[in-house]
């Protein structure tokens, strides 16, 4: 019996023998296609080839493409674990013809691979095929050449409500390449329910589609007209997991060798015994998508691809919790995954350390809120009477406890409860509105300015140009002229001003002509034109007028130093921390640089020092900063780094600094690394799970920062009557002395508290024979209150003590209950009741509990509530 790895390799070997180029699986993050969330089909990496926008040195290709369908239009997440064949991650085996062979060869290749004893050797009588209703050519090839009986060939027409909307007609979009397809089905036998495709029972599991062969032979125009393509092509896809299930004689994808091994390992780690539990299937599926997404550069976050990854991880963690996992388990599956994926696991293996760290950190982070969130959800579900969970509750779980909506839906599904998603969406929209209102300032020109044409950029070599005004915008509207005092956007035919992009801020400066000055505060791109945003301080400007465009050269120079330093920093991070480091965001201004990057754990002081030292070494090396224009494939062949998800043109600008750094970049840079002068890191911290941020300064700004630090050190040394060299020792002495005094003071407070205890015993009131002390004591910290409560419990023998203290505008609450009363009076219950009055929360043991609060004005009310509650319950 063939393993899944052997089937994958045999497919590639077969098509290689038929003259196909074996092409590596592309990344799960689509390159040059920001419209696509994840790679979800084998043809994604060849999309531009099919559209005629890209040429390859081969006309036949074959791949084993990794795919993810979670989030976006293609989303299988909610079905994973509940069906035999849904996955977030799967491999698509495919063969492609770019104007080479067509229907006859495509069909014969598929049949030979499936049925030949040399390859898969499937019984011919087990295979059924479908064709598009009017595709007589494909029908005849199947029937007359291949020999499939007419009763096992099914014509499928337009079954989706409009012309050419059919299971057997494929289209790339509303317009563009399209064509009929033929699908091959495997019959598992009459012991399994289901009917052939096109029948009322087609949704059963007896007849399973294993291969789809698409014939791209038309170009659909906007009016619906179908034109024949001059060079028709072929795009095919066969799910590796499905064909493995057929060849391994199982009816569920989760019973093939890869999943059996992952399920067994998961059960071993979490201590599960029922290997058919759906939670094991969920986890086995999710480790594949999560590991490969991280290996391809996706980091868990709260937006975009990162949020889909976070949703999948959290769903897996929740199912581990259902199985009884008591500690982090998910990351422990990575070594087994690498093993079962064989050759296809090499990309995860190359980044194994980073994959495991990120999975562990994300799981640990979610574990902190999982229990509390599930408790809230359980309570809410117990009160559901109409089978619908409130959207407000679902949003609170999302907003406060980090529960993605599909995770909450997963829990609800197990209890046959649905979610009011409209209410959830309203809450989400309200939050977005609040966030937008909080962040809005000035005019959002991007939302109102639409300009055709293209601005010629001259800023790589010039800081001053003569230019003609092609458009003016005032208050977001196109105008013919502007007057002094008006803020506006000026569009020029050509410009030396750099428009904000790639993290680099837009240039500032001014536009001038005789008697006219327009102060440019920022430069932004609107499509292909550059907008100069600012204020006309004197004179008037009109469309068609010529002006001198003059960039603030000093600001531009400082910005260029920071941009070049950012490239050196990126290279240094990868050299010292590892190749898992990739850019996740940047801001390059004239004053400083900020760089966000993938890094699963904190950076040590020693590593930070190494990074800074390495960057400064490369600055002193005084490398020339070289720029070259080349096609993107040549750039990547040279090792140039490109950002995931960025769309690049046919030609790209490659920036090289010696043998240390090579990146794609369109920004402004220093001429030599030595121009940077000095690089100094000023902060380093985490900004999200798995993402760190470094802020740094360069050149004169770095020198100024160091001078300021020296000034602070000198002033501090003077205050402590020390010198800079012995300052740390002097501070340590002061800290030791302070700790000693604080300890002595605490002892005095505790002694005073115990001495005051006898006075409280005398003032205790009796409620149904039980001694109760409920008092406000200001200026006493929690630790002293606890000592006092313990002492009073001993003195009373039997009783309840509730103290509230205001210290530094915060409320401290402590409740003590003697052991003989804890059966009916719980300290935690009482302290929480008091905490609600002062805007806080707390907890503890039945005999001792503490809480804090932020509303000292309500302390008297908290004491009264405690007294009333005790009157009622004692």
From Swiss-Prot:
It catalyses: tRNA(Ala) + L-alanine + ATP = L-alanyl-tRNA(Ala) + AMP + diphosphate. Pfam families: DHHA1, tRNA-synt_2c, tRNA_SAD. Its cofactor is Zn(2+). Gene3D superfamilies: 2.40.30.130, 3.10.310.40, 3.30.54.20, 6.10.250.550, Bira Bifunctional Protein, Domain 2 (3.30.930.10), Threonyl-trna Synthetase, Chain A, domain 2 (3.30.980.10). Its EC number is 6.1.1.7. The keyword ATP-binding applies. It is found in: Cytoplasm. Consists of three domains; the N-terminal catalytic domain, the editing domain and the C-terminal C-Ala domain. The editing domain removes incorrectly charged amino acids, while the C-Ala domain, along with tRNA(Ala), serves as a bridge to cooperatively bring together the editing and aminoacylation centers thus stimulating deacylation of misacylated tRNAs. This is Alanine--tRNA ligase. It comes from Haemophilus influenzae (strain PittGG). The gene is alaS.
């Amino acid at each position: 019996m063939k393993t899944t790895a052997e089937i994958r390799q045999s497919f590639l070997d077969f098509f290689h023998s038929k003259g196909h180029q074996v092409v590596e699986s592309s990344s799960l993050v689509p390159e040059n296609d920001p419209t696509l969330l994840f790679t979800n089909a084998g043809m994604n990496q060849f999309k531009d080839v099919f559209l005629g926008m890209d040429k390859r040195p081969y006309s036949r290709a074959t791949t084993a493409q990794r795919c993810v369908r979670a989030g976006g239009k293609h989303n299988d997440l909610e079905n994973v674990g509940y069906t035999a064949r849904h996955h977030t991650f799967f491999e698509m085996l495919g063969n492609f013809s770019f104007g080479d062979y067509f229907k006859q060869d495509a069909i014969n290749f598929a049949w030979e691979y499936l049925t030949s004893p040399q390859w898969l050797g499937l019984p011919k009588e087990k295979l059924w095929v479908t064709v598009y209703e009017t595709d007589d050519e494909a029908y005849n090839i199947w029937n007359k050449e291949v020999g499939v009986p007419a009763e096992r060939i099914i014509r499928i027409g337009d079954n989706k409500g409009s012309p050419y909307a059919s299971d057997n007609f494929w289209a790339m979009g509303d317009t563009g390449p399209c064509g009929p397809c033929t699908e091959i089905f495997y019959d598992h036998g009459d012991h399994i329910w289901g009917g052939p495709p096109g029948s009322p029972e087609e949704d059963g599991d007896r007849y399973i589609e294993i291969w789809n062969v698409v014939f791209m032979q038309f170009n659909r125009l906007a009016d619906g007209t179908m034109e024949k393509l001059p060079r028709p092509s072929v795009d095919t896809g066969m799910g590796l997991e499905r064909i493995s299930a057929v060849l391994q004689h199982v009816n569920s994808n989760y019973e093939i060798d890869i999943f059996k091994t992952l399920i067994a390992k998961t059960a071993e780690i979490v201590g599960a015994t029922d290997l058919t539990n759906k939670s094991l299937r969920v986890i086995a599926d999710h480790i594949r998508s999560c590991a490969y997404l991280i290996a391809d550069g996706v980091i868990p976050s709260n937006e975009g691809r990162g949020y889909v990854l976070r949703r999948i991880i959290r769903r897996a963690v929740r199912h581990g919790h259902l199985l009884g996992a008591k500690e982090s388990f998910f990351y422990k599956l990575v070594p087994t995954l690498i093993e079962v994926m064989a050759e296809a696991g090499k990309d995860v293996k190359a980044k194994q350390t980073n994959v495991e760290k990120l999975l562990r950190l994300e799981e640990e982070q979610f574990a902190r809120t999982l229990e509390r969130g599930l408790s809230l959800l359980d309570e809410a579900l117990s009160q559901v009477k109409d089978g619908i969970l409130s959207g407000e509750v679902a949003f609170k779980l999302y907003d406060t406890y980090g529960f993605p909506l599909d995770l909450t839906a997963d829990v609800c599904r197990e209890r046959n409860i649905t979610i009011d998603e409209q209410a959830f969406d309203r809450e989400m929209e309200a939050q977005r509105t609040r966030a937008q209102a909080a962040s809005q300032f000035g005019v959002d020109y991007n939302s109102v300015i639409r300009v055709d044409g293209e601005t010629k950029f001259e800023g790589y070599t010039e800081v001053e140009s003569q230019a003609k005004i092609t458009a003016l915008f005032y208050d977001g509207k196109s105008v013919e002229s502007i007057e002094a005092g008006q803020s506006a956007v000026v569009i020029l035919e050509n410009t030396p001003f750099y428009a904000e992009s790639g993290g680099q801020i837009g240039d500032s400066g001014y536009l001038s002509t005789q008697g006219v000055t327009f102060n440019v505060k920022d430069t932004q791109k609107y499509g292909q034109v550059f907008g100069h945003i600012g204020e006309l301080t004197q004179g008037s400007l009109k469309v068609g007028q010529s002006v001198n465009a003059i960039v603030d050269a000093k600001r531009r120079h400082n910005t260029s130093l920071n941009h070049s330093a950012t490239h050196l920093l990126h290279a240094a991070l990868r050299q010292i921390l590892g190749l898992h480091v990739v850019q996740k965001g940047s801001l390059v201004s004239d004053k400083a640089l900020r760089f966000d990057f993938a890094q699963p754990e904190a950076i040590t002081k020693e590593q930070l020092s190494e990074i800074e030292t390495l960057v400064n070494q490369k600055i002193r090396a005084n490398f020339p900063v070289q720029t070259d224009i080349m096609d993107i494939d040549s750039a990547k062949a040279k090792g140039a780094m490109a950002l995931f998800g960025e769309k690049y043109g046919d030609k790209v600008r490659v920036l090289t600094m010696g043998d240390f750094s090579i990146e794609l970049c369109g920004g402004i840079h220093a001429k030599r690394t030595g121009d940077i002068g000095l690089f100094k890191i000023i902060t380093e911290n985490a900004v999200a799970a798995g993402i760190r941020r470094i802020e740094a300064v360069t050149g004169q700004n770095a020198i100024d920062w160091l001078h300021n630090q020296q000034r602070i050190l000198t002033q501090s040394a003077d205050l402590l009557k020390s010198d800079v060299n012995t300052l740390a020792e002097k501070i340590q002495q002061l800290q030791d002395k302070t700790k000693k005094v604080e300890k002595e003071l605490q002892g005095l407070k505790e002694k005073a508290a115990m001495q005051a205890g006898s006075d409280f015993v005398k003032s205790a009131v009796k409620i149904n024979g039980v001694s109760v002390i409920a008092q406000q004591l200001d200026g006493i910290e929690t630790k002293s209150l606890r000592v006092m409560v313990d002492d009073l419990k001993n003195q009373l023998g039997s009783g309840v003590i509730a103290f509230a203290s205001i210290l530094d505008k915060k409320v401290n609450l402590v409740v003590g209950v003697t052991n003989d009363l804890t059966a009916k009076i719980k300290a935690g219950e009482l302290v929480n009741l008091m905490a609600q009055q002062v805007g806080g929360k707390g907890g503890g043991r039945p005999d001792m509990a503490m809480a804090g609060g932020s509303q000292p004005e309500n302390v008297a009310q908290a004491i009264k509530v405690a007294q009333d509650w005790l009157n009622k319950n004692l």
